[in-house]
Amino acid sequence: MASTRKPSGHGAEVEAQKRSSSNSSTKSAKAETFEPMQLQRSVTNPRAVGIPESKRLPESFRKRSSDPAVCKPDFSSLSTVLEHVDSLTIDEKKTSGFGSVKTSSASAKLSDGTSSLGKTSGSAKLSGRLDFMESGKSSICRGSTSSDVSDESSCSSFSSTVNKPHKANDLRWEAIQAVRVRDGLLGLSHFRLLKRLGCGDIGSVYLSELSGTKCYFAMKVMDKTSLASRKKLLRAQTEREILQSLDHPFLPTLYTHFETEKFSCLVMEFCPGGDLHTLRQRQPGKHFSEQAVKFYIAESLLALEYLHMLGIVYRDLKPENVLVREDGHIMLSDFDLSLRCLVSPTLVKSAAIESDPLRKNVYCVQPACIEPSCIQPSCTVPTTCFSPRLFSSKSKKDRKPKNDTANQVRPLPELVAEPTDARSMSFVGTHEYLAPEIIKGEGHGSAVDWWTFGIFLYELLFGRTPFKGSGNRQTLFNVVGQPLRFPETPVVSFAARDLIRGLLMKEPQQRLGFKRGATEVKQHPFFEGVNWALIRCATPPEIPKPVELEKGAVSVAEAPSSQKTAAGLVLNAQKGSDNYLEFDFF
């Protein structure tokens, strides 16, 4: 089994893993079959979840589930259950002589027997693949000192509410609410753990089913004693509070959370489509087409805009953390490194590009402007940059003067919701995605998200990050000291390269999005033609193939690649003998 690395240093720990090269091979072990475990009804402490005494249902009104898995447990404790599941789903990590990680993963078929999953009629189809695939980006996190705690926990508080308007038609949400109305409180006794999806820095995640339904969830189980001893309680609390505050189509849903004497559990959305890193590896040339990139980038941008509006600086955007739902749309994940702060959304009058001398020559707003030489102000008129005006033969002297006041269209006010006052000294993120101001220790704010957004865009287009070196040290040096360069292939539009240039300005004050956030980024010509209001109606570049769950057995649909990854799960291994696993799902 994978061992958890002990924290190093006095309050400063590094969580690093070596990103495997694109040519590293992944071996899939033969599927194995095992009997699922029966769960013991746990005793949930009402005070632990904050239910007032007056609102607790009497014990006589709490109906017991008819599921035999709940009424007749085979295990004496949750620890035994989890240990038994873990022993059946171990992913063996092998390190090659070149430092690349080879993953031997078991796609286990679940034979349910007499459990409630087998009793449900028909087969449950989950769009996506249960793929297991390695991920190699080096993630680092300097442990919070007392100053970090005050810096990142004394900001705005997040309210916990069960009101989720975007989940009005979600069957899983309705099932959770029905159980809550019936039993008052949800606990481990209401779920059956089907399979361990993976383990990570602060917990393990299990594919689980709400007993008596066909509703599947990803349950993150964290050992509270381990979190306390490793000083990770703040990270776990931050993640839970952020998840509670979210209600957005491209962000995860926290359906419920509860605690036992030993464990803290988060029940979240199960994304069976994998992540964008895995999906990119399966593309020709291991990079996406520009049209596909525009789709994924646009949805990620809306998610970042929403987070910033709530005063949340994400700080961990990368393909491994962008999951693909069953319908092909995306969902950001993993919020334990996020920074919370105060923000004041305001409506400001928008000025035309021509009236702002600082923005006038930044980029050419015409789609035809694909050459770097075409960046003069004349490109802002609605004509092509390659030839003279074909439909106007009159010179400027012959033209009649226009009434500028009458013809000028007043722009609508813009919503600016950028936490520009956010400030942190923490050293967190992924080596290849770290912003220069983080590396130099100058303190950072929300502009780091626009830097990572640029790296993210670059990787999806070109199949690699722009500043990756031979090692982590060289990578950090390149981020700070090396200029941005673009490869000759694949060929991308000037608008795409110009957007990357604006996002990857090394000085945060000059970075695109620094002042007006997502509003400024969305106005870039790269996004021309994107209908932001109806983006959820757009057809995704790829819709995952279905995974059938019938009679308790997991059957992975045939994939175009032999590499199978767990739904939205990425296991990172540190180079060396530690065999340390970092879980990048949540």
From Swiss-Prot:
The keyword Transcription does not apply. Signal peptide: none annotated. GO terms for cellular component: cytoplasm; nucleolus; nucleus; plasma membrane. It catalyses: L-seryl-[protein] + ATP = O-phospho-L-seryl-[protein] + ADP + H(+); L-threonyl-[protein] + ATP = O-phospho-L-threonyl-[protein] + ADP + H(+). It is an enzyme of class 2 (transferase). It is found in: Cell membrane. Residues 191-527 form the Protein kinase domain. The activation loop within the kinase domain is the target of phosphorylation. Belongs to the protein kinase superfamily. AGC Ser/Thr protein kinase family. This is Serine/threonine-protein kinase D6PKL2. It comes from Arabidopsis thaliana (Mouse-ear cress).
